[in-house]
């Protein structure tokens, strides 16, 4: 066999092995990530213990990033069409911001209401890149109803296929129907962002 042809076939064999390894690694990753890959259409909620267990497992995956942003006590609610509302930008890790065009495979945003929020109190929570004003009986299409129950985490978003630049523009919106219960300058919720990005599929993640 001529050396050039042999080199070509050897290179193709290496590429095929690398592709199979990537597919196996990503399939394993998908299984590991299944606890958080819930879409908003199902209005999911899960126990906070399940989320933290998944988080501790996912931290071991190369390329995986988790960050946390808190609705701080200085948050002042405003009123809009009869609703108490609040919003906060997402805090995106600097390591991701250095690659604004990096494509995201999965994003899950988990909301945990502050334990001081009464269990009977009701919120609607949404994530988006622009303000969509709620009206009586009507909320943004991706808004999820959550209640003030300690220990409950709510996955409100699963948004594949966008870039880090888009993620940095997203804001978390909270709508509350009872302004008096929440009051001004109240802690409301902690939000965690789980991100899996395309670097996981690159060569450095191929198992040897």
UniProtKB/Swiss-Prot annotation:
GO molecular function: RNA binding
Region span, Disordered: 1-23
Domain of life: Viruses
Record's compositionally biased regions (Basic residues): 13-22
Annotated GO CC locations: ribonucleoprotein complex; T=3 icosahedral viral capsid; viral nucleocapsid
UniProt feature, compositional bias: Basic and acidic residues: 1-12
Subcellular location: Virion
The entry's keywords: Capsid protein, Ribonucleoprotein, RNA-binding, T=3 icosahedral capsid protein, Viral nucleoprotein, Virion
Biological role stated in the UniProt entry: Capsid protein self-assembles to form a quasi spherical capsid, about 25-35 nm.
Record protein name field: Capsid protein
Organism this protein belongs to: Pelargonium zonate spot virus (isolate Tomato/Italy/1982)
């Amino acid at each position: 066999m001529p050396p050039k042809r042999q080199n070509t076939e050897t290179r193709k064999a290496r590429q095929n092995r690398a592709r199979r390894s990537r597919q196996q690694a990503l399939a394993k990753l998908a299984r590991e990530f299944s606890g958080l890959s819930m879409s908003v259409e199902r209005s999911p909620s899960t126990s906070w213990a399940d989320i933290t267990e998944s988080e501790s497992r996912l931290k071991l995956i190369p390329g995986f990033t988790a960050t946390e942003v808190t609705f701080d006590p200085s948050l002042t609610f405003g009123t809009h069409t009869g609703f108490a509302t609040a919003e906060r930008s997402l805090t995106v890790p600097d390591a991701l911001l250095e690659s604004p065009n990096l494509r995201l495979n999965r994003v899950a945003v988990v909301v945990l209401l502050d334990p001081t929020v009464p269990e009977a109190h009701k919120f609607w929570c949404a994530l988006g890149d622009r303000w969509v004003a709620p009206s009586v009986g009507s909320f943004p299409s991706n808004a999820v109803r959550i209640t003030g129950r300690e220990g409950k985490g709510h996955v409100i978003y699963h948004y594949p296929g966008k870039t880090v630049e888009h993620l940095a523009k997203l804001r978390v919106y909270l709508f509350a129907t009872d302004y008096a219960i929440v009051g001004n300058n109240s802690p409301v919720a902690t939000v965690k962002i789980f991100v899996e990005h395309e670097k996981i599929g690159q060569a450095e993640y191929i198992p040897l």
